[in-house]
Curated annotation (Swiss-Prot):
EC number(s) from the headed UniProt entry: 2.7.8.-
Reactions that this protein is recorded to catalyse: 2 a 1,2-diacyl-sn-glycero-3-phospho-(1'-sn-glycerol) = a cardiolipin + glycerol
SMART domains: PLDc (SM00155)
Spans traversing the lipid bilayer: 7-27, 29-49, 59-79
Keywords: Cell membrane, Lipid biosynthesis, Lipid metabolism, Membrane, Phospholipid biosynthesis, Phospholipid metabolism, Repeat, Transferase, Transmembrane, Transmembrane helix
Pfam families associated with the record: PLDc_2, PLDc_N
Name under which the protein is recorded: Cardiolipin synthase
Protein topology in the membrane: Multi-pass membrane protein
Length: 502
């Protein structure tokens, strides 16, 4: 980084001299601006190159800066400055490590009791080593399909809370379902239940101050995650908390794809029916979900809640058929945890890989793994939305379809409504449900959390849900897909060029 600073100083000095000379001889403000902008672009290009980013990211940034200097310069100020990311999150990482050493089991001994094939066990070792959370055999899970089932279950469990409620969400809206949640939380707070609520400051930027203040007045602790006050001077806008977590009394937890908003109940006229998946967890694994929340709470408030009140011995339930493991991923971690576990799941497959992702923007590793699996004769299926909510991501996703189709991947476009489910099922034996999409933002930038399931009954429910979803989807034909208009191909190509930045 010192070399980068020296280069930066040199570029600025040279740029200033050129700018002054240009301004003196031509006397044109435009010339001064042009030279300064050129120097700024050169400086950013040097910084990006010296950071040793992934080649695709480096090339994408250089292409944007070269083609659209002013737009690229502003875009970089907003989204590209990752060089001090590790320093920002060092305090959180140190605290997280201390918490894990103190409160997690030293080794996943119980895993040996799982009825897993030898080729699947490396996945468990990887998950424990880079995810640092153990597999629980004393937990029960229930798949919640879509909004009505999810919110019914959430409100039923919230009503039972006696000691504490912890919530962490990316999007919270003050619409009908948001108001219902507010009323329940206010009532529980008045009953003496401690309610803590982390909401992402960017994802929930439309949330009204009145909504927040009403909750605070009732005793709910409302904390925004990484508020952004000066967007162009801080790239905090780029690292968002995409997690959806609820923990009730330390024994019941929820995680999955649904935020708090009426659209998740199918009340948005554009999207209509909203297809999503959430997971209810009871028992030992909830302790991991609690730890993830407490680590994020400490990061934003400095408050340590590592007491028996919140981390008492977990609620013991009857040992289930399989294992449950909660894994957190984020820019504060050394490893690309979610991506590496997705990769390991894909490469462990012997029969089938079924993926549902609303935003499919894979990096080269995941893309290659899917193609190799399909070429090897494995039943690889991708379920994606037919109706976009983010057009640039939609077009970027479709740019990957031709090579996947050529490799033998079956691609289904969901037609009943909008697909927002983030699920992977491998061989009908392993699965992941959570907040992470199969895209670069979830892999590298966002704070995410997924539940990895091993030989649980819930996996059978996920398989049934997939089969039902395929009934409401159309399978893309390669020859027909190649007939799409030239303007669409251009949109896909440009979007794909930007995909490392998305």
């Amino acid at each position: 980084m010192r070399n980068t600073s020296r280069v930066a100083i040199l570029v600025v000095i040279v740029g200033a001299l050129l700018a002054l000379t240009n301004g003196f001889w031509e006397g044109k403000l435009l010339g001064l601006f042009s030279v300064l902008m050129s120097c700024s672009v050169i400086f950013i290009a040097l910084v990006i190159s010296l950071e040793n980013r992934k080649p695709a990211q480096t090339i994408a940034w250089l292409a944007v800066l070269g083609s659209f200097p002013i737009v690229g310069f502003l875009f970089y100020l907003l989204f590209g400055r990752n060089y001090w990311q590790q320093r920002r999150y060092k305090k959180k990482a140190d605290f997280d490590e201390a918490v894990l050493l103190k409160f997690q089991e030293p080794s996943p001994i119980a895993v040996e009791r799982l009825p897993m094939a030898p080729h699947q066990r490396p996945l468990l070792r990887l998950a424990y080593r880079i995810g640092q959370h153990p597999v629980s055999l004393a937990s029960q899970t229930a798949v919640l399909t879509n909004g009505e089932e999810t919110f019914s279950s959430i409100f039923a469990e919230l009503e039972k809370a006696e000691h504490h409620i912890h919530l962490e969400y990316y999007i919270v809206r003050h619409d009908e379902i948001g108001q219902q949640l507010k009323r329940v939380l206010m009532e529980k707070a008045r009953q003496g239940v401690r309610v803590r609520f982390l909401y992402d400051a960017v994802g929930s930027w439309k949330l009204s101050n009145a909504y927040i203040e009403e909750l605070r007045a009732a005793g709910v602790e409302m904390i925004p995650f990484s508020p952004v006050r000066l967007p162009f001077l801080s790239n905090q806008i780029n690292f968002r908390n995409h997690r959806k977590i609820i923990v009730i009394d330390g024994g019941v937890g929820f995680v999955g794809g649904l935020n708090i908003g009426d659209e998740y109940l199918g009340k948005n006229k554009y999207f209509g029916f909203w297809r999503d998946t959430h997971l209810l967890i009871r028992g030992e694994a909830v302790r991991t979900l609690q730890l993830i929340f407490l680590q994020d709470w400490y990061y934003m408030t400095g408050e340590r809640l590592l007491t028996p009140d919140y981390l008492s011995p977990p609620l013991i339930v009857e040992e289930g058929q399989g294992g449950v493991q909660l894994i957190a991923g984020g820019p504060d971690q050394k490893w690309e945890v979610i991506k590496q576990l997705y990769f390991a799941m894909i490469t462990s497959a012997k029969r089938s890989i079924w993926v549902a992702s609303p935003y499919f923007v894979p990096d080269e590793d995941i893309l290659t793994a899917l193609k190799v699996a399909a070429l090897s004769g494995i039943d690889v299926r991708l379920l994606a939305p037919k109706r976009p909510d983010k057009k640039i991501v939609f077009y970027a996703s479709r740019s990957y379809f031709p090579e996947l189709l050529e490799a033998g991947v079956k691609i289904y476009e969901y037609e009943k409504g909008f697909l927002h489910s983030k699920v992977i099922v491998v061989d009908g034996e392993l699965a992941s449900i959570g907040t992470a999409n199969m895209d670069m933002r979830s892999f590298h930038l966002n704070f995410e959390v997924n539940a990895f399931l091993y030989y649980t009954d819930s996996i059978h429910k996920l398989v049934r849900d997939f089969l039902e979803d395929f009934r409401h989807a159309s399978m893309i034909d390669y020859e027909q897909f190649q007939q799409r208009p030239f303007r669409v191909r251009i949109a896909e190509s440009v979007s794909r060029l930007l995909s490392p930045l998305l």
